[in-house]
Amino acid sequence: MAALFLRGFVQIGNCKTGISKSKEAFIEAVERKKKDRLVLYFKSGKYSTFRLSDNIQNVVLKSYRGNQNHLHLTLQNNNGLFIEGLSSTDAEQLKIFLDRVHQNEVQPPVRPGKGGSVFSSTTQKEINKTSFHKVDEKSSSKSFEIAKGSGTGVLQRMPLLTSKLTLTCGELSENQHKKRKRMLSSSSEMNEEFLKENNSVEYKKSKADCSRCVSYNREKQLKLKELEENKKLECESSCIMNATGNPYLDDIGLLQALTEKMVLVFLLQQGYSDGYTKWDKLKLFFELFPEKICHGLPNLGNTCYMNAVLQSLLSIPSFADDLLNQSFPWGKIPLNALTMCLARLLFFKDTYNIEIKEMLLLNLKKAISAAAEIFHGNAQNDAHEFLAHCLDQLKDNMEKLNTIWKPKSEFGEDNFPKQVFADDPDTSGFSCPVITNFELELLHSIACKACGQVILKTELNNYLSINLPQRIKAHPSSIQSTFDLFFGAEELEYKCAKCEHKTSVGVHSFSRLPRILIVHLKRYSLNEFCALKKNDQEVIISKYLKVSSHCNEGTRPPLPLSEDGEITDFQLLKVIRKMTSGNISVSWPATKESKDILAPHIGSDKESEQKKGQTVFKGASRRQQQKYLGKNSKPNELESVYSGDRAFIEKEPLAHLMTYLEDTSLCQFHKAGGKPASSPGTPLSKVDFQTVPENPKRKKYVKTSKFVAFDRIINPTKDLYEDKNIRIPERFQKVSEQTQQCDGMRICEQAPQQALPQSFPKPGTQGHTKNLLRPTKLNLQKSNRNSLLALGSNKNPRNKDILDKIKSKAKETKRNDDKGDHTYRLISVVSHLGKTLKSGHYICDAYDFEKQIWFTYDDMRVLGIQEAQMQEDRRCTGYIFFYMHNEIFEEMLKREENAQLNSKEVEETLQKE
């Protein structure tokens, strides 16, 4: 018994209602002895069944324009079917099938090269009608009249998804087979039990009529045996049918059971079994129904900020992979933990069932609200604030999980080195997806302009918050220019701990680059009433973000991706996503209102505090990590490395900073007589650095009230370190005697129009311009350029030495830039639509690595968009930007292409079977 499965556009004609509109449908032609039928599955969720045996009046096939075919089927009751849009092969196969049925010449049609057996299932609704209604029409027994009235069969009474029951397709089939055996052994006993449960009156009538059923037992047994074989075949081939009213997933119970089994095996065990050979076959079915895949997220009430952020996060393959690529048993994680909430949403975010999405989003919102009460109600909130809380809470979640299942070192010591390698089974740790993907490390150098004391502070951040230019410019700024301005040197009102001088110079640089660089534009400013207002100025969205100019020799590249052998099967996740597109009723436990979900498992938070600053390398070998740690760094240049606070101090950033000090210290002169404001007897060679003790205690640095807010320091660390062994390189000690201090430098507020200038403007009045240097990395303020140009004059002999030092420094910086080019590629944008800060709507534009196109996510609405159009439309509304390191981006594309090739090979293999 075979089935023909094809696709076309169908119109149904009726003498009473007329002809319906043309609708796309999947057509299933089922051939059985005297029970041939045609089943139409529509996109709307409905399906229609037409009996063909002894019911066909006429079949006409017409072809026109070469490849367009039109089939007209007329039934005995003058109803008709008009089918078009069929290929020539499909049209001929369907015509042969209908003619054979019309002529009562039953020969199973063969469709070469097609996987028809995969879709040879019939609906349980039809099985119920056949097995429990029509079989007993010949019998005078009224045993199944109740089943006929309710349309519910014995098979439907079997429990489906419960918290304690998880059955695979094979297990369900085995249970059904056992029930059939009991039914065949004693049909009357089965009828008695069934009727006792439903209606005692009918049970008495059935008991009186049992004697009349004996003669039909043999025939019934044969028919039931035939139905059982067909049922087993259907279960083995597709496992996708149910009678829940869902259009194509008719027998959703089997789908539910198999789906939950897969999810439980995937989530609740350390590894999943590879015994599920039917997953690829199930994948084929869902590819026939792409309309059942819904990528949008429902709005729970002013939760567009949450939907936009979640769409951006979950569209990043490396983050999704790291979220699921954990070695600890998922069954031990509380269901209301944020890690589990994100994992479940990652599985079911594409399901067609909106109620499931609402439930998952509500649980996730409760998990966030347990730590941040601002998100508890239905008020409008800021997307960046939600992103910050989400990443921080997820990181804290993983730190406490690492504390619970703390990896043991091979030496049995608690202070095992924090950099744990996944290829060491005894020292494997649980990588945090936030640390491996978003966490970046900045080195903030603050130098006193009076005594030259330098304070080095390491800052760990998950994103960079960047100010927009406050002055209106003729040409719009870009993400690149505002990003470069953030890393430019600037003057700070910072009180020196040594000499109590109030003016310092601060410079930022990268110590470690992230895989994903999140750039947050501060789209707010003060109005005339000193109140915050939204800043909707136009900003050009850069497709590529270059960060090499803000790196140095000690800058570490992003953490490497997991090796192919260690990556969790991301294709499996896609299959499960498609499988869950049906009406799956999964009951999740209520979220527990607690500010610390994992608190009962932890005795003290001291260990988690010690784990701050861990770098866990997941899935990379020792050789790769040594290459990672040693790349672009030399032992002689590395002064010290502190793993506890991630301080990575090199000569390069210090020299960079001191070069800037040498320039700016000579460019300002005293107002009276042009004499220096400070004594020239303070050499740079006496610069002191704060040292870091071996076991530093964390102390919070407190600024005095006289200082302005330093908004550049997003998350300053609690530690200030002293290291008396660190000194300025010798090449700068010669300049120390010529250094003059000043405190009259002005802070330039105006930002560059485009990327920061790479050279000084050509002076028109100075005679000696050949010695004027072009430093590419020293972002000097515009207000100081005129005084800097005075250094080109030979009237001051010390200027030549200073310029020579600056020139040598610029050449060295240029050579360092040539060693490696770090570029980031735009992959997602979160935008705020609205005129005020307290109202509006959030949307998300994200790059789909599987389809390699951009999509706009507006809650439940998902639309494709061109990247250039997106960049143009989001100039005034772009708020949060996600950039992926270009090497990681290319690697992701290669992996996706390989996965698609493997998937295509699997499909071709399955179709040949």
UniProtKB/Swiss-Prot annotation:
It is an enzyme of class 3 (hydrolase). Its EC number is 3.4.19.12. Deubiquitinase regulating several biological processes through the deubiquitination of components of these processes. Involved in somatic cell reprogramming through the 'Lys-48'-linked deubiquitination and stabilization of CBX4 and CBX6, two components of the polycomb-repressive complex 1 (PRC1). Also deubiquitinates and probably stabilizes the androgen receptor (AR), regulating the androgen receptor signaling pathway. May play a role in spermatogenesis. This is Ubiquitin carboxyl-terminal hydrolase 26. Belongs to the peptidase C19 family. Keywords: Cell projection, Cilium, Cytoplasm, Cytoskeleton, Flagellum, Hydrolase, Nucleus, Protease, Thiol protease, Ubl conjugation pathway. The active site is at 304 (nucleophile), 841 (proton acceptor). It is found in: Nucleus; Cytoplasm, Cytoskeleton, Flagellum axoneme. It catalyses: Thiol-dependent hydrolysis of ester, thioester, amide, peptide and isopeptide bonds formed by the C-terminal Gly of ubiquitin (a 76-residue protein attached to proteins as an intracellular targeting signal). The gene is USP26. It holds the Pfam family UCH_N. Expressed in testis. Gene3D superfamilies: Cysteine proteinases (3.90.70.10), Ubiquitin carboxyl-terminal hydrolase 26/29/37, pleckstrin homology-like domain (2.30.29.180). PANTHER family: UBIQUITIN CARBOXYL-TERMINAL HYDROLASE (PTHR24006), UBIQUITIN CARBOXYL-TERMINAL HYDROLASE 26 (PTHR24006:SF911). GO terms for cellular component: cytoskeleton; cytosol; nucleoplasm; nucleus; sperm flagellum. Residues 601-636, 753-772 are annotated as: Disordered. Residues 295-886 form the USP domain. InterPro entries: Papain-like_cys_pep_sf (IPR038765), Peptidase_C19 (IPR050164), Peptidase_C19_UCH (IPR001394), USP37-like_PH (IPR032069), USP37-like_PH_sf (IPR038093), USP_CS (IPR018200), USP_dom (IPR028889). It comes from the Eukaryota. It is linked to Spermatogenic failure, X-linked, 6: A male infertility disorder due to asthenoteratozoospermia and characterized by reduced progressive sperm motility and morphologic sperm abnormalities, such as thin heads and short or coiled flagella. One of its GO terms (molecular function) is K48-linked deubiquitinase activity.
